Amino acid sequence: METSICSPENRYSHPYKPYDIQIQLMDAIYDTIDNGYKIGLFESPTGTGKTLSIICSTMTWLRDYKRENVFQPMAGLDGSDTDDSDSDDEPEWVKKAYRDTIVSRSENKMVDYEMYLEKIQNEYENNIQTAGSIKSSRPPKKKRSTAKKQELHDEDFLPEDYYSDSEVKPNADKLTVLESEISQLLDKVNGRTDEIEMTNDCPVNIYFSSRTHSQLNQFAHQLALTKFQSSFKGVEERTKYLPIGSRKQLCINEKVKSFSKNDSNINDVCVDLQKSKEGCQFLPKDYLNSSLTKKLSDLSLSKIHDIEEIADLGSNMKVCPYYSVRKGVEMTEIISLPYQILLSESTRAILNLQIEDSIVVIDEAHNLMDTITSMHSVCITIGEMNSIIKALKFYLGRFLKKLNSGNRIHLMKLIKLCQLVISFIQKSEKCNNIKVGNEINTSDIYQNSTGDMLNIHILEAFLAKSKIAYKIESYMEKVAENENEQAKTSSSNPLLYKIVQFLKCLVNPSKEGKFFWDSTNGITSIKYMLLDPSSVFKDIVSKARCVILCGGTMEPMSEFKNFLFPYVEDKKIKSFSCNHIIPPDNLKVYPVSSQNNVTLEFSFDNRNNPLMIEALGASIVRICQSVPDGVVVFFPSYKYMNHILSIWKSTDVLTQIESQKKLFEEPTSASQVQTILADYANTIKEEKKGAILFSVVGGKMSEGINFADELGRAVVMVGLPYPNAYSGEIIAKRKFIESEAIARGCSMSEAQRNSQSYYENLCMRAVNQSIGRSIRHINDYSIIYLVDCRYQSSRIQNKLSSWVRKRIETRNYNMDQIMEETRDFFMCKTIARLA
């Protein structure tokens, strides 16, 4: 049911009649921004309209702010104003007339801009229709064309001659350099020559960031449903939205796209092409002052476009959308961008994204700390180092005579560094000096060698300036594809970018990070990991007016306060957890502590108990007998799931399960996930048979996959999925937490409790993420079984999402009682559906 944007009961201009919990969430977000909170922590279960609630509350606040602070006669003109035209000597009617004139000018300027956007949008669509490129008033999305394979020659893989900062380039054209510098200065002085010169009088923007491309596209589609009251008079104010993407999403140059295989590569290829004589055909040399790029930036604001539609605009206009859209940043109200751009201060500066005094909204924020950590971490093994050395030697052998001395010397030094790292790992293994999680003193890598003469600072600068990594990677790919099997073993895309990242960490190790030993499947590695993500996030928190963190599974929220912004006072943090939109009787949550008098506790020491594994099988058989349609079972790991299934295959447990429901297993290969899901859904929906899906916490199906309606009538969580306590990451992180606690004056026992709490919270966030997969809309219903006696603990229950916690059966039911209630639950739902 749609409501008018002007009606009092629809304060937030929601496109539909909002549910009570949506109004509560919108109220909480608006209050957080309006009352000066620095941080807002919000949990809203998936399926409750979280994205629209975020959009409506933040945009309503922004329009209110603009109306009161930009387009009001008193805005910015208080008694301290010293302008002679509004002095205390003037009569009040003169002051009012002056203020009205200022506001009128601002409003007229915005009215003109709105009309201009309407005009260019209509012109563009008419031109496209005339050309026969669209068939409706809203252009259907065109499939982006696949890059054609470009013919690449050896010269394409050569870097420019390299000279360090202390070297002088021979025959440097000083006049050319001077002319370039003068041209840049003139650009700054003259500014751009816009068809309509516009400046944004409102310093506040909304930045919406999420983890994946699909989530950002969904945001654009939800935003397109909305319409908000204008902040000024005279014309309807459109929502000015700009999606910021990477070159990989926005590049329209086929040569660049065919040359590049990953994000780092495409950036280097693009910059390299701009420096070349021919340049990029889609990027005007003076693109900052180009009317074509200006028009594309304005067109991008004329209506809500997702990132593919922005790329299509650029293709149709034959102008680079990546560089053009950034010109529209100044006039936007709301900008969407991926985590990687938001969290990089240097990238924000390049794109002219000013978060000062703005609202920063981070969706799916349960991923935020992991994303920050992974962006500033790197891991490298002997095998990878050997592959890098092979690639470097192969490249040098081919181009040795064509490379200048600067490139040759630095590439040989890079080989030397890789050999030193290999030697260091091998010596440490021989001396039994490797203990997973133990810190590495990087100076030990050069011990008893001439490695300290390499000057890794200069080496890192060489890799950064020369952009040689993508040249080598691309050449190795070409040779591997066309000629030489040896090169195939040498090609290890994108390992050269990994050594670049490794060198950056060696050169500038953060005091909040550590180098340490790690091991995966018996393979030793050196790992650098950022241990304190708050140091990176502080830049955003300190600059923004307000930071809103939202997610479907934000509990335990204490983790964010402790590790992401420990410096923010509690009184400046607002937390809010939504209930679910479903009626209270549409979800039951049962802790399952025992079966056949066997206690179910899947702790590390007890998890292989054969009696308990048999009891687990009996429990799942009974659940399959009582629950219709689909059942999803989550195990702590692939290894444990396979172990359990192998035991059940040797007994009759799997036979009993398969007599009730068709069995599916989560594949380890991502390419097989959609096939398994389709078969699972088809069995339930089309064949009208029951099915059971064995999945893994943190696997392919625990996040982003929805088991709505009959696909997930029950979710079974087996045990508490603690991460591997003996992994290098966990050991290093817990040591860091303990050392930080002791530095603050805590006792050793308090410090250990802090690190144990962190470890437990990792587990509970994974639980919340997995069990939230089943309820997707207001009429959905399901049962959650938490199979482990430890779920009876109030400490564990308090770390579950609030909407789950509120529905836990607190009576200590045995399995017979749970199954009786299960049958009653589904019988009632069947009767209600048929009534």
From Swiss-Prot:
Residues annotated as binding [4Fe-4S] cluster: C251, C270, C280, C320
Keywords annotated in UniProt: ATP-binding, Cell cycle, DNA-binding, Helicase, Hydrolase, Iron, Iron-sulfur, Isomerase, Metal-binding, Nucleotide-binding, Nucleus
GO MF annotation: an example: ATP hydrolysis activity
Pfam (any one): Helicase_C_2
Assigned EC number: 5.6.2.3
Catalytic class of the enzyme: isomerase
Cofactor binding: number and manner: Binds 1 [4Fe-4S] cluster.
Residue numbers spanned by region Disordered: 130-167
UniProt motif DEAH box: location: 363-366
Domain Helicase ATP-binding: 8-421
Biological process annotations from GO: establishment of sister chromatid cohesion; interstrand cross-link repair; mitotic G1 DNA damage checkpoint signaling; mitotic sister chromatid cohesion
Annotated InterPro entries: ATP-dep_Helicase_C, DinG/Rad3-like, DNA/RNA_helicase_DEAH_CS, Helic_SF1/SF2_ATP-bd_DinG/Rad3, Helicase-like_DEXD_c2, P-loop_NTPase, RAD3-like_helicase_DEAD, Rad3/Chl1-like
Signal peptide: none
Major localization class: nucleus
Location in or out of the cell: Nucleus
Catalytic activity, as annotated: Couples ATP hydrolysis with the unwinding of duplex DNA at the replication fork by translocating in the 5'-3' direction. This creates two antiparallel DNA single strands (ssDNA). The leading ssDNA polymer is the template for DNA polymerase III holoenzyme which synthesizes a continuous strand; ATP + H2O = ADP + phosphate + H(+)
Xref: PROSITE patterns: DEAH_ATP_HELICASE, HELICASE_ATP_BIND_2
Family: Belongs to the DEAD box helicase family. DEAH subfamily. DDX11/CHL1 sub-subfamily.
Protein name: ATP-dependent DNA helicase CHL1
Source organism of the structure: Scheffersomyces stipitis (strain ATCC 58785 / CBS 6054 / NBRC 10063 / NRRL Y-11545)
Gene of this entry: CHL1
